[in-house]
């Protein structure tokens, strides 16, 4: 019964507005509290931003940097609020984490012209995993354009170390995109959705540097594919549907033409 309930919950969440995912998820957790852990681990939520007072930098929150009610900053490697006996990556993995955070901060500035990024690593049995988080929020209303948008991307990479300096990188990527406009001509329009894709590749590696390069290459390629898919399929299809539904001529103009046609018909009938 539990598996069926979980399947129904996930199916329901896929059909509800992505912009209300947090409220809808909270409602589900109230209805089926026994599935709390499964639902929280299965449903991606918009990323939240926190501030690291030690490094004076923003970082992103997720389940992968949470221990109890505290979150670890990738910049200072400290938990907020402080937590005794908390989990930390091994020193070797921490080196990878530090370098990856520096790399993806540069990546975010180049591709998104700013935003917040965080990379977290954790140890597995003879292997390791990492998550790359990126968030970009744009508010054009401050510039006089009634448009706001948010891009959240979550890339989870599991690295299986093999023999002869070979490693298999399994990537699961999710992008959540939200765009909202509000003006007199169109009214309030909200487009939101999410997309998940997977990829797996084998690369050679050489300690810290190569792992960061390999993960960075996969994330960059995946984000490019996801952006293209969102633009050509999802937004392209939305535009096609809107163009099919809307009238090229306004309703008031159509009403005027209809009245004129009726008047002409009446006039012709009277002449006959």
Curated annotation (Swiss-Prot):
Keywords of this entry: Actin capping, Actin-binding, Cytoplasm, Cytoskeleton
SUPFAM superfamilies assigned to the protein according to its UniProt record, in alphabetical order: Subunits of heterodimeric actin filament capping protein Capz
One Pfam short name: F_actin_cap_B
Domain of life: Eukaryota
Keyword Cytoplasm (UniProt): yes
Alphabetized InterPro entries for the sequence: CapZ_alpha/beta, CapZ_alpha/beta_2, CAPZB, CAPZB_N, F-actin_capping_bsu_CS
Main localisation: cytoplasm
An annotated GO cellular component: cytosol
GO molecular function, one term: lipid binding
GO biological process annotation, one example: response to bacterium
Subcellular localization(s) per the UniProt record: Cytoplasm, Cytoskeleton
TM spans (from-to): none
Protein task: F-actin-capping proteins bind in a Ca(2+)-independent manner to the fast growing ends of actin filaments (barbed end) thereby blocking the exchange of subunits at these ends. Unlike other capping proteins (such as gelsolin and severin), these proteins do not sever actin filaments.
Subunit (UniProt): Component of the F-actin capping complex, composed of a heterodimer of an alpha and a beta subunit.
PANTHER family: F-ACTIN-CAPPING PROTEIN SUBUNIT BETA (PTHR10619), F-ACTIN-CAPPING PROTEIN SUBUNIT BETA ISOFORMS 1 AND 2 (PTHR10619:SF0)
Family listed: Belongs to the F-actin-capping protein beta subunit family.
Name listed for the protein in its UniProt record: F-actin-capping protein subunit beta
Gene name of this polypeptide: acpA
